[in-house]
Each structure stands twice: as structure tokens, then as C-alpha cells.
């Protein structure tokens, strides 16, 4: 049995960063990864990087003289080449640390300090003083007759490897993941249909913003089937056949590819956490405290697996929290990192930090609200996409920014300016009067916050 100070399960953003940090301190560390295809974690291999590469390629589609099929296949092949390089670079960076050993295999707890690692028929055991779980999450597949991932039925992770151009694509779910893929494939030339049980997209967002998103997608030619309950799925050599009901009426749809985008679930089943006495939530995520410790103080959970926001930058921040604790400070915890922004690469990009208007009113705030159509922003005209809406929510009692939603080109960059203002508790007037360079999307913050009354 191998005995080490630290065992990390999962080669994600937090896990790989922590492995190098501990190794550089001279602490013997083992990092276990189930699949060599996942060195570096979800973001690099099957998430942010490949999806945004394809989204960027889709945006450039009009500049190519290739057929849709040729252009799409070349984009996928280029994506695969990039991911292979990043995967190898991530492995090499960790494996080159003299105090870190990378083990390929499936890790499962034998007891609260011992983990078995299975690689084919070989089984080894590792005893560690501290264990850090960074196994992430995976796409959730709802229970529908015939719904099995295969040649023509995909998750967000498998669709990006499809080299054959789909002339038609149905997407189950109108959340951010489904909408991201809908935009990319519509721009590649695919006929896209989104199926959702709800009666509108993005129900958690403010209605005025959601309406702008819907209009933008309809402008791309994306069809929406709201109030649609999927009954059955079948696939053959040429198509996927979907049976669904709308208002009690049974309907059929056949497409060349089908994407299931109905959320994500924790990768914890194979860990045998019960053997370690580690508690999980009803959804399978590991319960943690503000220092990311489980109910077993020497077992930590970082990244998506602990049930927090599923973004790679949160996984990196989880590393900072654990590092603070291990350095005997513990001064930086989950409680100190608000506010956290997010961006979804829709058409155009959707970004938000803090509260929506709906959330602010539900919490009882007295608020001021300002909106700005993206058509009023000069840089949007230059970029060739004037779709979108900026929206700000301000506390009427102290002029603090409660939340901002930016639906517009380059919002993933602009939102970080707002985050900094909120973190440093600046009044909204700072952004109303800030001198910005011109022409930029950021300068529209002058007009947005200048409209706060």
C-alpha cells in the first residue's frame, strides 16, 4: 500500500492546481484520474474551451467558401487538435512535479483514509492523511423510453466530437447549455429546434431580458416547442425520431442529431463515499462547510462535485479556499467570495452578476432599475450585432449595485468591471462617471448607470 500526505481524486482545475501547490511545498501527493481524456478537467476537454472554439468558428462561417459540411468538419478537427495539445500540456505540468504521482484509474473509498484505484484488472491502494475530491459533474439524462446516448443522440460532451455535419438538430432543454449549442449550430447552417416542457426560456431571468434572448434566437431561425413533454425516442441509421405531446396532442419530429441539455449531476456514485462516511445531498453532491471540508474534516470537495456554481473559475477559487485552510489561515472561505459573475455564450453573450430585478424585489429591497438597449451602443454597430439589453439594479437606500445583466456582444468582458465595483462596494455613480475608452462596449456602462433614477 502506498502512503502519502495528500490524495487528490480528479484532474480538474482545483485538483491539478492543488497538486502542484502541494508538490512544490515538498509534500508527497498522488493525483488519480479516471480517464486520460480528462487531464485538465471538464473545461479544457469537454466544456468551456471546445464549445467556445466551435462557437467562434461558427461566428466566422460567413467568411468561408467551403460547404457547410466541410467547414463544420474542419472546425471539429481543429478543435480536437487544440484539446489534445491542452490535455497533454496539463498532464505534463503536473507529472513533471517530482513530488506528485499521477495514477490512471477509477478511485473508490475503502475507508475514510484509504482509496482503491482500479485500472483494468489491476487494483492498488493509497492511504492518505488528507483526501481532496475533484471529480466534477456530468450531463444528466432524464428517464425517457429509448433515450440512450449513441451515434445520433448526444450530450454536450459528445456532440462536439461529431464530425458529420447535422442538417437538423433537436435540443432537449432551453437552459444556457442548450442555448449555447443552438446558436453555434444554427450559425453552422443546421436547422435547430429546441424542445422544452416550460412555457418560456430562462425562467429564472427577468422577463424583459428573456424576451430579448428569445427574439434573438428566432432571428437565427431557431424554432421553439414550449410546453412539450418528450414521450419516446428512437434512432436508426439516418435519424432520431422523437414523440412528444403539446397540450395533450401527440406529435412527431425526426432530426439527424439530438442533444440532451437537461442539466448536470455529480460524479460521486463510483466513489463509494459511504465507506468513508462522507455525507452527500439528495442530488449526490458532497456536503461541505465554508472551508470545503466534508463531515470528515480531512476529506475536502472542490469544484462541481460540492454543489456550488459549476464554473472552472469557481473550481480555481475552491483551490484558494483550501490553500488558505491548509496554510493555517482559513481567512478566505466560501463566504468571502461574493459576488460571482457568469457568462453564457449565447447570441450574443449573456452575462450576469448579483440579483435580477425579480430576485431583488423578492428579497424586499427598495430598488432603482435602469435599462439600455444595445442598439444605443456605437461599438455594437461596429461589431455588426445590435441585439441585446443592458440592465442594472441598484439599492435605492444606499446606491450600491445589487445586480447587472448584460445581454450583448463582449458582455463577458464588460461584466468583470461591474464585479470589481460591487466587490469594492462602489456606489453606482462611479460607473456612471467612469472615463472609458471609445468605442467600446464598456463605455455603455456610463449610459446604463446614468439612467438610474
Each model region followed by its residue ranges:
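Glycine-rich flavin
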Residues: 2-4, 21-27, 33-165, 193, ...
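Catalytic nucleophile loop
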Residues: 15, 175-178, 315
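Short hydrophobic core segments
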Residues: 7-9, 107, 126-136, 172, ...
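Beta1/beta-strand and adjacent pyrophosphate-binding region of the FAD-binding site
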Residues: 1-12, 165-175
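Flexible, glycine-rich terminal cap/loop adjacent to redox cofactors
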Residues: 9-37, 42, 49, 53-54, ...
Amino acid at each position: 500500500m502506498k502512503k502519502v500526505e495528500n490524495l487528490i481524486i480528479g484532474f480538474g482545475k482545483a485538483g491539478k492546481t492543488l497538486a502542484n501547490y502541494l508538490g512544490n511545498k515538498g509534500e508527497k501527493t498522488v493525483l488519480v484520474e479516471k480517464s486520460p481524456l480528462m487531464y485538465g478537467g471538464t473545461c479544457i476537454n469537454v466544456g468551456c474551451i471546445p464549445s467556445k472554439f466551435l462557437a467562434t468558428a461558427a461566428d466566422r462561417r460567413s467568411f468561408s467558401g467551403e460547404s457547410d459540411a466541410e467547414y463544420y468538419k474542419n472546425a471539429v478537427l481543429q478543435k480536437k487538435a487544440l484539446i489534445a495539445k491542452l490535455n497533454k500540456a496539463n498532464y505534463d505540468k503536473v507529472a513533471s512535479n517530482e513530488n506528485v504521482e499521477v495514477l490512471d484509474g477509477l478511485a473508490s473509498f475503502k475507508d475514510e483514509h484509504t482509496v482503491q484505484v482500479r485500472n483494468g484488472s489491476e487494483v492498488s491502494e493509497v492511504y492518505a492523511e488528507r483526501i481532496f475530491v475533484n471529480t466534477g459533474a456530468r450531463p444528466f439524462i432524464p428517464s425517457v423510453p429509448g433515450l440512450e446516448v449513441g451515434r445520433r443522440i448526444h450530450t454536450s460532451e459528445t456532440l462536439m466530437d461529431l464530425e458529420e455535419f447535422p442538417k437538423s438538430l433537436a435540443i432537449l432543454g432551453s437552459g444556457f447549455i442548450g442555448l449555447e449549442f443552438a446558436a453555434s449550430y444554427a450559425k453552422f447552417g443546421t436547422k435547430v429546434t429546441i424542445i422544452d416542457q416550460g412555457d418560456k426560456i430562462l425562467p429564472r431571468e427577468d422577463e424583459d431580458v428573456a424576451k430579448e434572448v428569445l427574439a434573438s434566437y428566432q432571428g437565427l431561425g431557431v424554432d421553439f416547442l414550449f410546453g412539450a413533454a418528450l414521450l419516446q425516442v428512437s434512432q436508426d441509421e439516418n435519424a432520431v425520431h422523437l414523440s412528444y405531446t403539446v397540450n395533450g396532442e401527440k406529435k412527431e419530429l425526426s432530426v439527424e442529431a439530438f442533444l440532451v441539455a437537461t442539466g448536470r449531476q455529480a460524479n460521486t456514485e463510483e466513489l463509494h463515499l459511504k465507506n468513508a462516511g462522507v455525507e452527500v445531498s439528495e442530488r449526490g453532491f458532497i456536503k461541505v462547510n465554508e472551508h470545503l471540508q466534508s463531515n470528515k474534516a480531512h476529506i475536502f470537495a472542490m469544484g462541481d462535485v460540492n454543489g456550488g456554481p459549476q464554473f472552472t473559475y469557481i473550481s480555481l477559487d475552491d483551490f484558494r479556499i483550501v490553500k488558505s485552510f491548509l496554510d493555517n489561515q482559513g481567512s478566505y472561505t466560501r463566504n468571502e467570495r461574493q459576488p460571482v459573475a457568469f457568462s453564457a455564450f449565447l447570441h450574443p453573450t449573456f452575462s450576469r452578476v448579483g440579483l435580477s430585478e425579480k430576485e431583488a424585489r423578492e428579497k424586499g429591497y427598495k430598488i432603482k432599475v435602469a435599462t439600455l438597449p444595445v442598439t444605443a451602443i456605437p461599438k455594437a454597430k461596429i461589431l455588426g450585432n445590435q441585439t441585446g439589453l443592458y440592465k442594472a439594479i441598484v439599492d435605492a437606500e444606499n446606491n450600491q449595485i445589487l445586480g447587472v445583466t448584460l445581454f450583448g456582444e463582449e458582455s463577458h468582458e464588460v461584466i468583470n468591471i461591474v464585479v470589481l465595483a460591487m466587490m469594492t462596494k462602489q456606489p453606482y455613480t462611479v460607473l456612471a462617471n467612469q472615463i472609458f475608452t471609445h468605442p467600446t462596449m464598456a463605455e455603455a456602462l456610463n449610459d446604463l448607470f446614468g439612467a438610474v433614477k
